[in-house]
């Protein structure tokens, strides 16, 4: 079981970031999804067995848990919701209820145990870049082209 609420814009941004590495088609259905882990905050991970992205977003977590949702379906649903707080709740069978304003959706998730473990990057080799730094690098790249 899992329950949290989060601003739609923050959630949509995190989904967009993590979805960049999700496999479009895979023999492993979980790889077409995003791993959602609710603890003190919400962590969303995308992985295609070669590249992975993990991003964290501020959320009001009522009940901790984790599950996998199809990235395309989840992203489309959140994108179509009104700009308000999204309330996410999942039961023990991974049935997810999403509500935001007048919009309500029910979708079936997958168990987090179906999701492959992302490799751990050692601190000696990791890179941490603030989002603003990435925006500047993107601008510089466009300027140089």
Q: What residue ranges belong to the model's regions?
A:
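Structural preference for solvent-exposed beta-strand-turn elements
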Residues: 1-145
